[in-house]
Amino acid sequence: MIYGIGTDIIHIPRIEQLINKYSTKFINRILGKNEITIYQSLSIKQQTNFVAKRFAGKESVAKAIGTGITSSLLLRDIEILNNNLGKPIVYIPNAAKILLNNIKLTEYKIDISLSDDYPLAIAFTVISASI
């Protein structure tokens, strides 16, 4: 059963402006520890696209959960990493798992698709669940 669907689209130049203005403070607010390691290994252009896709992805995950970003579910707490084939995989913290369990989701799967084509990045998330 589909529990939730979320999507988000972002203007990449907006992310570029925020990175230029706030630098590390902005990155630390958006990316998790594992994502920061990946971010630091990328070229400047790749970094901006990486952050834009992660920002859109995290927003779409929060929308699919049904809460949006809240004090118990921060952007940096959701990590979107890639498997060895490049497929994006969503990792969520215990707080989000507790939130999903509180709304009676005992078994769930989060699928996400990320794409960027300058000047836009988009994410689409589907949460499938057993209730």
Curated annotation (Swiss-Prot):
InterPro entries attached to this UniProt entry: 4-PPantetheinyl_Trfase_dom, 4-PPantetheinyl_Trfase_dom_sf, ACPS, Ppantetheine-prot_Trfase_dom
Catalytic activities: apo-[ACP] + CoA = holo-[ACP] + adenosine 3',5'-bisphosphate + H(+)
Cofactors (names): Mg(2+)
tRNA-binding in keyword set: no
Coiled coil (residue ranges): none
Any one GO biological process: fatty acid biosynthetic process
Broad EC category: transferase
UniProt entry tagged with the keyword Iron: no
GO CC list: cytoplasm
Pfam families: ACPS
Function as written in the Swiss-Prot or TrEMBL entry: Transfers the 4'-phosphopantetheine moiety from coenzyme A to a Ser of acyl-carrier-protein.
Family assignment from sequence similarity: Belongs to the P-Pant transferase superfamily. AcpS family.
Protein name (database record): Holo-[acyl-carrier-protein] synthase
Organism from which the protein derives: Orientia tsutsugamushi (strain Ikeda)
